[in-house]
Amino acid sequence: MAAHYLDFERPIADLESKIEELSKLSETAGPGAFESEIQALRDRAQQMRKEAYAGLDAWQKTMVARHPERPHLKDYIAGLIDEFVELRGDRKFADDQAIVGGLGRFRGVPVVVMGHEKGHDTTTRLKHNFGMARPEGYRKAVRLMDMAERFNLPVITFVDTAGAYPGLGAEERGQAEAIARSTERGLVLGTPMVATIVGEGGSGGAIALAGANKVLILEHSIYSVISPEGAASILWRDGARAKDAAANMKITAQDLIQLKIVDRIVEEPAGGAHSDPDAAIQSVGDAVEDELKALMKLSAAELKKQRAARFYAIGREGLQ
């Protein structure tokens, strides 16, 4: 069973607890005992999971996007990138582990890969600052994109952040400028770039790694200019109304594809990416490979033109 269940998953959790209890009884009762009962319960749990995830509202999707067991950047690197060599530091101030990146081979193709890393436990979450990057993280991203262009390598990014770190030190070191430079660098990159929103895509801290030719999004991920809690605090002076804000912000993958802010939705396993991380990772890999193959046929000038047209069209199309 999963270690963490969301509120709407409680009936599934109860059923899986019964499955576990029955499985333990079958071990003492002998081979084949309760086999049909266990299988029937598993089938029922799977059906409940499909039904629950088919009808998620925007706030529930936000909770799924933030699920602590959802695969993060390092999981995608481990599952998709061979011969990965991490590159550290911005060559100006420090190395920010909220953004991890380097060189590797994606299904045989040399690439530059980078993204936000949130961490999976207390130690790694603190190390990676919960995926909230400081200026040096975005300057590291610019450095990696510069390298990609110099050596004519495609860029693959994974976006998963609540937003850039808002601390005093980050602001003193030029957080806004660093985000702007990273966004700009992606928009004028002369090599193919594919970004995937794999969890949260929050504010400028997310778009700084998503100035890509193609922006993909996992089925239950979100992408927005501000968190639902932040929007509720501004609109109603009450962060507790985050659910109301989420319902009106058009932050889900399904909203975003209709608005033409993202280009493709990657389906998740029944029960979300956290229910079967390996399958989710391979689904993302298949989608990225598909997009990358088409983009690699374009010249640098064509890539820049396509990317510019894509972003200029946002706000003009899909709003009818």
Curated annotation (Swiss-Prot):
Pfam families linked: ACCA
Chief place where the protein resides: cytoplasm
Signal peptide (UniProt feature, chain positions): none
EC number assigned by the record: 2.1.3.15
Cellular-component GO terms for this entry: acetyl-CoA carboxylase complex
Residue ranges annotated for the CoA carboxyltransferase C-terminal domain, each copy included: 33-294
Listed pathway(s): Lipid metabolism; malonyl-CoA biosynthesis; malonyl-CoA from acetyl-CoA: step 1/1
GO molecular function, one term: ATP binding
Keywords recorded for this protein, A-Z: ATP-binding, Cytoplasm, Fatty acid biosynthesis, Fatty acid metabolism, Lipid biosynthesis, Lipid metabolism, Nucleotide-binding, Transferase
Cellular localization per UniProt: Cytoplasm
Similarity field: Belongs to the AccA family.
Name of protein: Acetyl-coenzyme A carboxylase carboxyl transferase subunit alpha
PROSITE patterns: COA_CT_CTER
Catalytic reaction equation(s): N(6)-carboxybiotinyl-L-lysyl-[protein] + acetyl-CoA = N(6)-biotinyl-L-lysyl-[protein] + malonyl-CoA
InterPro entries linked: Acetyl_CoA_COase_a_su (IPR001095), ClpP/crotonase-like_dom_sf (IPR029045), COA_CT_C (IPR011763)
Function: Component of the acetyl coenzyme A carboxylase (ACC) complex. First, biotin carboxylase catalyzes the carboxylation of biotin on its carrier protein (BCCP) and then the CO(2) group is transferred by the carboxyltransferase to acetyl-CoA to form malonyl-CoA.
Subunit structure of this chain's protein: Acetyl-CoA carboxylase is a heterohexamer composed of biotin carboxyl carrier protein (AccB), biotin carboxylase (AccC) and two subunits each of ACCase subunit alpha (AccA) and ACCase subunit beta (AccD).
GO process terms (BP): fatty acid biosynthetic process; malonyl-CoA biosynthetic process
